[in-house]
Regions:
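Radical SAM enzyme core and accessory elements
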Residues: 10, 63-64, 72, 77, ...
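Short, small/polar residue-rich loop motifs at catalytic or cofactor-binding pockets
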Residues: 40-43
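Short, electropositive alpha-helical surface patch
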Residues: 25-38
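C-terminal accessory region of radical SAM enzymes
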Residues: 1-28, 61-107
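Short, acidic, Ser/Thr-enriched surface-loop or helix-capping motifs
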Residues: 50
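Short acidic/histidine-rich active-site segments
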Residues: 58
Length: 169
């Protein structure tokens, strides 16, 4: 409400996460934010190369390795081939947990088309790649924001709609 009011009073201020969600809701265009796509972008939209040549599915996976969790390490450029890392069983397995259409509580969620499921985040926060939606903080946050955005869109308020579209352009 505060950010909407700022915009109504003439201060252009974009709420970044809401803008990403609105782009998913109001347009056919991708956001480029790999956490809000299905499958999630881990290992397929980008990877992280570490100083020692290790290749991780995401920066979060690289950070987990700092705590001795190497599960999301695809290999090492000095030891493994491209095929081994990017067409190997590990990446295929990880991606199988990155599709909201296949995950419990995501596949039948009304907001599923606007979300993503990050197996790295789930492993880090909940101990497995699926995660448990009722206690998943990212899920709770995203669903509550999407619900709020739909409430505002449902009002058909021309001023709010103008603000939302200004965030997308």
């Amino acid at each position: 409400d505060y950010i909407i009011e700022l915009n109504k009073k003439g201060t252009f201020f974009v709420e970044g996460f809401a803008a990403l969600l609105l782009r998913r809701i109001l347009t056919p265009f991708a956001t480029g934010f790999v956490d809000l796509q299905s499958p999630a972008g881990v290992g397929i939209a980008g990877v992280i190369y570490d100083y020692d040549g290790s290749v991780y599915v995401s920066d979060e996976a690289r950070m987990m390795a700092r705590f001795k969790n190497y599960y999301f390490r695809l290999g090492n450029v000095n030891e493994n081939s491209y095929q081994e890392m990017f067409n190997g069983e590990l990446l295929h397995h990880i991606i199988s947990f990155a599709c909201t259409e296949c995950l419990p509580a995501c596949s039948d969620c009304v907001f599923q088309p606007y979300c993503g499921a990050d197996p790295v985040r789930n492993m880090s926060e909940q101990g497995d790649m699926v995660g448990f939606r009722p206690t998943n903080e990212m899920c709770k946050k995203t669903k509550s924001i999407i619900h709020y955005l739909f409430e505002l869109l449902h009002k058909h308020d021309p001023e709010i709609n103008r603000i939302f579209w200004s965030w997308l352009n």
